[in-house]
């Protein structure tokens, strides 16, 4: 007989607040309401998951108390599980709602209470709210009490953990509750402070700023609104609040605005946080850890790749970030050095394991007294460097490193230009910095423990090919090598006799000058998973050559600048999932022949590719069997012939700037997996064919998930260095006639401006903003 589960509590399960007002999430509520009232006969569990403070419970309660929903059910009952709970109390809470009284049931054993609840629900259509479920076992304890007799009964379940939501789901997919939009943040703040009244126009600007500083989290907004409600409704008071929010509490949410996933994983590995497991790479294990944190909503995803949906960037909520920083300080793990913080002020902390600096001068000052520090991270952009000539702020790396005897990580990711002259730092595993030189000294091999080498280049430096010494092939522990436009300076015979870099997984962006050199380098890197390279072959053979890429290669990007040329080889990569070709001339048979060697390809992107044979591309039956995403950007393609059985699993088709193409093949009407077509700056005949495909997909195939997006406006992209004055830059750009969208991607360092605008005027203004150091 089951009496009490391992998690027990003497108090009744917490009852959610029923009258809490909710503002925002209107689209989410409508979507969930439809699921609750759908015609699906079987029992369905509507799972809502997300990080603490998003308003999962409030949202669930709004649905649970919605008259249009409740009126469709015979019985409504709820319970709140929490991390520590009593199984008996949960059953009593549900029985109290189901039968109106549970006073005579408290003395019954748990199994009889569960049976009573099940029999009460059995003949009726019920709506159950199970709030705050922490693990699968808690759901297992309750699910047997909810019978499924095909009468459209529904269960709303809230949890912080994605795995729990997925585990409990039946028909409907779990809903990951998003952060607030900016307008929702303001509406909630205004509602909480002013009630039914409107905010004074004098306070609106600062109010909008305060709402933005709350980090799009409803809980933070409610907390701040409570404080504002008790303050004078004066601009000065609200300005003070805004300034306070810019301090160490809520502003820490924005301290590291986004965390680049690739960088994070490389740092984890360099710090030895990831333990090896037979048959799995360290990168795969690290990705598993990250997915676990995301699934538990401890880490928020801020950006996914538009190609495959993989996480590209994330962030920590301010509460969790503050907790991590405090624990790190308590355990002597991390010390963040502020701009004006001297070594004297925190002398007792000099032997921290990791130091994070926001000013380069601090690093120079601290280097003399931090010999045991293992990691140094320069974590923010210093405007000083934007105002000075590059040569005036190049730091001699050797002078800094000589004092950090046991340094494992040196991450100067922002624009700190260093004089790269490596010394014998045997422990260094991770190095990221900017350089202003065209060659690397052979002494780089002294860093024989190095696993990650990222050398970004100044705008002037990018114009020249960077020469790497032959000693680079002696660095057998390298896992990730990222240097724009580089080539190895070595004789073929020397390279042939060098060691293989078995651990190297990512290589970008190397420069291949011949097929033979490409073959030789690929033989020396047998375990590559990601390769980005420029192809500038001097000779182009009359006959195609099959170039065998490493078996584990999953991502390949091949570029050619200047005039389009034929790729002198077919690509053979049995496990390749992602392929991007840019700046090449392809005859009509090239992709067909290559496709035979790419059976697992899921993403294909062609950028400024010119199709030969009168601009024709033929795709035969059965080609690209696993392809999900196809993007054609500014390709010279006039006639596209696709067999009926090609692209059988295609989900997305994107055409941008394909001015010569006359139509999308009609066989796309019959691709049942197709979900999305996007057209940008294409011919009217292409638009018409896309609309015909949309009609066939939606009406004939009943593909309700299909979406057609037609973009008519102009899009301009610019390379930028930073976004520290982005608000002022946005205001300047937004004032230009025709500009209706501005976005920034600091992972890719790209500014995008869109609208029906004067392109030359926009380019002129952006150029001035960059020159002035605002971008």
From Swiss-Prot:
Q: Which residues form the NB-ARC domain?
A: 17-237
Q: Where in the cell is it found?
A: Cytoplasm; Membrane
GO MF terms here are: ADP binding; ATP binding; metal ion binding
Recorded hits in Gene3D superfamilies, A to Z, give: 3.30.70.100, P-loop containing nucleotide triphosphate hydrolases (3.40.50.300), Ribonuclease Inhibitor (3.80.10.10), Winged helix-like DNA-binding domain superfamily/Winged helix DNA-binding domain (1.10.10.10)
The keyword Cell inner membrane is assigned to this record:
no
Tell me what else is known. This protein is encoded by the haplotype A genome of the allohexaploid Solanum demissum.
Annotated protein name in UniProt: Putative late blight resistance protein homolog R1A-3
What species does this protein belong to? Solanum demissum (Wild potato)
Q: What is the lineage of its organism?
A: Eukaryota, Viridiplantae, Streptophyta, Embryophyta, Tracheophyta
């Amino acid at each position: 007989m089951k009496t009490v589960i391992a998690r027990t509590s003497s108090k009744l399960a917490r009852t959610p607040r029923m009258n809490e007002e909710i503002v925002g999430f209107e689209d989410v509520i409508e979507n969930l309401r439809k699921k609750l009232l759908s015609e699906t006969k079987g029992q369905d569990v509507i799972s809502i998951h997300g990080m603490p403070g998003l308003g999962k419970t409030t949202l669930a309660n709004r649905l649970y108390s919605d008259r249009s929903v409740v009126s469709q059910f015979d019985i409504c009952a709820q319970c709140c599980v929490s991390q520590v709970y009593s199984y008996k109390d949960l059953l009593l809470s549900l029985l109290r709602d189901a039968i109106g009284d549970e006073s005579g049931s408290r003395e019954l054993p748990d199994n009889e209470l569960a049976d009573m609840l099940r029999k009460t629900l059995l003949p009726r259509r019920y709506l159950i709210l199970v709030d705050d479920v922490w693990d699968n076992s808690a759901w297992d304890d309750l699910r047997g009490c909810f019978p499924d007799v095909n009468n459209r009964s529904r269960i709303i379940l809230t949890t912080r953990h994605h795995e729990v939501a997925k585990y409990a789901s039946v028909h409907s997919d779990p809903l990951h509750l998003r952060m607030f939009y900016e307008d929702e943040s303001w509406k909630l703040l205004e509602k909480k402070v002013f009630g039914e009244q409107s905010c004074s126009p004098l306070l609106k600007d600062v109010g909008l700023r305060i709402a933005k500083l709350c980090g799009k989290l409803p809980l933070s907004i409610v907390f701040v609104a409570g404080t504002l409600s008790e303050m004078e409704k004066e601009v000065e008071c609200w300005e003070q609040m805004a300034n306070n929010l810019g301090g160490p509490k809520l502003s820490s949410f924005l301290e590291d605005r986004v965390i680049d996933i690739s960088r994070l994983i490389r740092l984890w590995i360099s710090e030895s946080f990831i333990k090896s497991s037979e048959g799995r790479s360290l990168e795969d294990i690290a990705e598993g850890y990250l997915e676990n944190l995301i699934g538990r909503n401890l880490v928020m995803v801020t950006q996914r790749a538009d190609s495959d949906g993989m996480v590209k960037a994330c962030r920590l909520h301010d509460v969790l970030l503050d907790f991590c920083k405090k624990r790190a300080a308590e355990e002597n793990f991390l010390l963040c050095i502020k701009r004006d913080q001297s070594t004297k002020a925190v002398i007792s902390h000099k032997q921290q394991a990791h130091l994070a600096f926001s000013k380069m001068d601090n690093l120079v000052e601290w280097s003399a007294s931090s010999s045991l520090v293992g990691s140094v991270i320069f974590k923010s952009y210093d405007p000083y460097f934007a105002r000075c000539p590059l040569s005036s702020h190049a730091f001699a790396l050797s002078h800094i490193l000589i004092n950090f005897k046991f340094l494992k990580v040196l991450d100067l990711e922002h624009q700190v230009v260093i004089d790269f002259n490596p010394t014998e730092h045997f422990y260094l595993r991770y190095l990221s910095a900017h350089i202003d030189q065209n060659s690397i000294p052979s002494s780089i091999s002294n860093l024989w423990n190095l696993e990650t080498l990222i050398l970004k280049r100044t705008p002037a430096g990018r114009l020249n090919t960077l020469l790497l010494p032959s000693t680079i092939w002696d660095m057998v522990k390298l896992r990730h090598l990222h240097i724009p436009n580089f080539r190895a300076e070595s004789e073929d015979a020397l390279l042939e006799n060098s060691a293989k870099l078995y651990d190297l997984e990512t290589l970008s962006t190397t420069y291949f000058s011949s097929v033979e050199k490409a073959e030789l380098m690929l033989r020396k890197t047998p375990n590559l998973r990601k390769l980005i390279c420029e192809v500038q072959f001097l000779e182009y053979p009359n006959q195609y050559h099959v170039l065998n890429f490493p078996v584990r290669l999953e991502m390949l990007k091949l570029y050619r600048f200047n005039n389009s040329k034929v790729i002198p080889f077919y690509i053979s990569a049995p496990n390749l999932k992602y392929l991007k070709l840019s700046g090449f001339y392809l005859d009509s048979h090239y992709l067909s022949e290559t496709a035979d060697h790419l059976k697992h390809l899921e993403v294909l992107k062609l950028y400024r590719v010119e199709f030969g044979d009168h601009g024709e591309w033929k795709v035969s039956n059965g080609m690209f069997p696993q392809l999900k995403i196809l993007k054609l950007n500014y390709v010279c393609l006039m006639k596209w012939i696709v067999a009926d059985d090609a692209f059988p699993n295609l989900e997305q088709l994107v055409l941008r700037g394909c001015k010569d193409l006359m139509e999308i093949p009609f066989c796309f009407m019959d691709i049942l997996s197709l979900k999305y077509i996007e057209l940008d700056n294409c011919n009217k005949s292409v638009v018409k064919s896309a609309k015909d495909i949309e009609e066939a997909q939606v009406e004939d195939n009943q593909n309700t998930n299909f979406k057609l997006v037609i973009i008519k406006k102009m899009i301009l992209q610019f390379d930028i260095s930073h976004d520290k004055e982005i608000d002022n830059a946005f205001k300047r750009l937004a004032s230009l006639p025709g500009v209706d969208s501005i976005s920034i991607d600091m992972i890719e360092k790209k500014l995008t401006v869109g609208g029906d605008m004067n392109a030359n005027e926009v380019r002129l203004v952006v150029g001035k903003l960059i020159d002035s150091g605002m971008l």
